[in-house]
């Protein structure tokens, strides 16, 4: 959400400003999503396609859940604190000093997102193979950085 404000004493300039920005806004924000919107409209017209979409969505939900379950169990086992997690794309690891921990992990080619008060792990983008053992690596980096969670 945003606003575009034009200030002028000329009605012609104000009208041109409005027309240009209507066109630009539609071209910038409406068109990129229109293909996806039309695709969803076509899918929802066909019960078979809806069933396939639901099955695919359930498959990805389960895949992310399995990854998160692995990480949460391993985090509990090694004493790495995490924020409560029910479902979703991200798990948050609370701490102050996340930049230091993430920098250390990057040296091992582990790329997490440092936040002001923690680290965000995208369980949606890390394979099960790579998520296994990750909690212990994060915990080791936290301990090496002398950070108290």
What are these regions (language model features)?
Residues 1, 86-90, 107, 116-118:
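Active-site lining segments that contact anionic ligands and/or coordinate catalytic metals
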Residues 1-16:
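Active-site PLP attachment segment
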Residues 7-8, 45-49, 140, 144:
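Short, well-ordered loop/turn and helix-capping segments at boundaries between secondary-structure elements
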Residues 15-37, 42-72:
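Structural signature of PLP-dependent enzymes
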Residues 53-105, 125:
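Conserved PLP-binding catalytic core of the aspartate aminotransferase-like
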Residues 99-149:
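PLP-dependent enzyme catalytic core of the Aspartate aminotransferase-like
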């Amino acid at each position: 959400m945003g606003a575009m404000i034009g200030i002028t004493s000329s009605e012609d300039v104000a009208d041109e400003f409005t027309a240009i920005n209507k066109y630009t806004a539609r071209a910038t924000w409406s068109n990129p999503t229109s293909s996806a919107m039309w695709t969803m409209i076509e899918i929802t017209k066909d019960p078979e396609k809806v069933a396939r979409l639901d099955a695919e969505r359930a498959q990805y939900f389960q895949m992310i859940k399995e990854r998160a379950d692995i990480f949460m169990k391993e985090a509990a086992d090694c004493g790495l604190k995490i924020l409560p997690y029910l479902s979703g794309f991200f798990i948050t690891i609370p701490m102050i000093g996340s930049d230091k921990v993430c920098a250390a992990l990057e040296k091992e080619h582990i790329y997490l997102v440092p936040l002001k008060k923690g680290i965000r792990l995208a369980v949606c983008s890390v394979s099960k193979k790579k998520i296994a053992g990750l909690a212990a690596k994060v915990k080791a980096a936290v301990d090496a950085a002398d950070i108290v969670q």
